[in-house]
Amino acid sequence: MSQMEHRSPGVAAYALAKGRFAEIISDLVHVDATVLLAAYRAIPRLYAITDATAAGMPDGTFEWGGRRVIKKGQRITLENGTTLAGSAVTMLDAFRNLISLGLSLEQAAEMTSTRQAEYLGLQDVGRIEPGARARAFVL
């Protein structure tokens, strides 16, 4: 994605200014915590996503998509060690990250479940209420 600059704002700034729905990788690797909170305050229906490219993998160097990558903690980089290639953060990790940033349980649940269903126009999933399909698990 293009960088956000004051004279050439790019897609991210447009989402902040005009977005009704937008997704954000809530791994604190792709997006800094301060930027994530700013987006949360600016975009009414911001929802969390994760690429989880190496979730569950041990730290180390491995082949992924025809390239050598390095996994260290939650961060995945190309072999040069600086170019971000992904993260190992699951949606549960993203939920925990949102809580760690000060969002309430309800706000974090909305960002990791409810809003995706709303975006897709699904009325019977993503929430716990009468008539909704039961898809709950204990965290």
Labelled PLM ranges:
Residues 118, 124-139:
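C-terminal cap of metal-dependent C-N hydrolases
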